[in-house]
């Protein structure tokens, strides 16, 4: 069945483009599991024009927008600089332009984008002989006021097998970790530096969110962090990051779950993903996200012991029909999560009661 689009020439009071869709029509992204292709149009070209210098460079792989007036570009061969992510001023790239770009991408990819449907994924037309780039757009109310965008371009390189030869493979020899019992803070700082995935466990009012913010502050400022939470309580550790907000669907707004946002987060080029709290079906998506190239991620869970935290995660994962037994699910969770930090409150004081490496909890 074809997507039914309702296009308006004006802008609604919310400031979002009025591009809706029939509730009876399936989302092409969720139905087919891939971004919808986008036909080329003069309007799309006009809205992408400020990004043309980077879209036309073969060495550029990522173009990111976190806030108005600037972009972040990952360039393997920049002019006059070192390879990597660079922050660039681009005054034209404001929320209004991103709204219009989202409207165009939605229209010609047969999708919807408005405050009820603030997530949009698509594949842009091919430019300069390159394969089509993938674009992810996230708008309010699923963000902290501003639009977020990521364009990922594939570099097509023809390299011989010999190009991957760096000589004999030497096993990595990391220095020992600090003792978690004697030096818990030094241990955690080193675990964060080494990109260990950390789960914070504790009961109600044990300070899990406050502690999570303290850990976020230890992440190196040059790493890109994507936050996923119900309310904006977490603090981005650096300039290159974005916060996504789950929406419950009240007052005619979007119903966007943490699971939906995790799928979008994977397309926003994160170094680390931080999920405010594991509660249900998003557990499997979080574990898979970590296991597919995002180590060093964090989350929290309600549990009274480190072993109980892994048991809780296994239970929530099994409710998603993961297809594994309880023992297999527990082992999988322990293989993905490196460290469990247990918090408690004694005599009104919150603190760390235990730090456990996950593999010791299921042995």
Predicted features along the sequence, with ranges:
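Hydrophobic positions on the alpha1 helix immediately C-terminal to the Walker A/P-loop
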Residues: 211
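N-terminal accessory targeting/assembly segments
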Residues: 1-130
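P-loop (Walker A) phosphate-binding loop of NTP-binding proteins
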Residues: 191, 201-204
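Conserved P-loop NTPase
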Residues: 331-363
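Switch/coupling sub-region of P-loop NTPases
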Residues: 181, 185, 195-201, 214-336, ...
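P-loop NTP-binding catalytic core
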Residues: 81-194
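Conserved lysine of the Walker
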Residues: 208
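Flexible glycine-/small-residue-rich
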Residues: 65-67, 75-77, 124, 139-141, ...
């Amino acid at each position: 069945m074809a997507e039914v689009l309702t296009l308006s020439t004006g802008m609604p009071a919310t400031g979002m483009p009025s591009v809706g869709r029939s509730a009876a029509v399936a989302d092409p992204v969720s139905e087919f599991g891939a971004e919808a292709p986008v036909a080329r149009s003069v309007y799309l070209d006009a809205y992408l024009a400020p990004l043309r210098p980077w879209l036309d460079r073969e060495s550029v792989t990522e173009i990111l927008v976190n806030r108005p007036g600037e972009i972040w570009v990952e360039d393997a061969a920049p002019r006059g600089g070192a390879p990597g992510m660079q922050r660039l001023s681009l005054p034209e790239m404001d929320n209004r332009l991103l709204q219009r770009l989202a409207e165009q991408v939605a229209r010609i990819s047969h999708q919807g984008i408005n405050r009820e449907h603030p997530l949009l994924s698509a594949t842009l037309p091919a430019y300069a002989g390159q394969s089509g780039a993938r674009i992810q757009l996230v708008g309010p109310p699923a963000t902290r006021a501003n639009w977020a965008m990521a364009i990922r371009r594939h570099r097509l390189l023809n390299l011989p097998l010999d190009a991957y030869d760096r000589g004999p493979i030497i096993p990595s020899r990391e220095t020992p970790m600090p003792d978690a019992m004697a030096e818990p803070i030094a241990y955690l700082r080193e675990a964060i530096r080494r990109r260990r995935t950390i789960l914070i466990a504790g009961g109600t009012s044990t300070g899990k969110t406050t502690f999570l913010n303290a850990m976020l502050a230890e992440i190196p400022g040059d790493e890109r962090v994507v936050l996923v939470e119900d309310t904006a309580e977490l603090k981005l550790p650096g300039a290159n990051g974005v916060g996504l907000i789950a929406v419950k669907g009240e007052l005619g707004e979007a119903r966007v779950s943490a699971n939906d946002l995790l799928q979008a987060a994977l397309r926003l080029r994160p170094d680390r993903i931080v999920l405010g709290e594991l509660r249900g079906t998003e557990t499997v998506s979080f574990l898979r996200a970590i296991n597919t190239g995002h180590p060093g991620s964090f989350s929290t869970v309600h549990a009274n012991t480190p072993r109980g935290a892994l048991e809780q995660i296994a239970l929530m994962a099994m409710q998603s029909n993961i297809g594994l037994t309880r023992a297999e699910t527990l082992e999988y969770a322990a293989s993905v999560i490196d460290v469990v930090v247990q918090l408690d409150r004694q005599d009104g004081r919150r603190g760390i009661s235990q730090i456990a490496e996950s593999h010791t909890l299921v042995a």
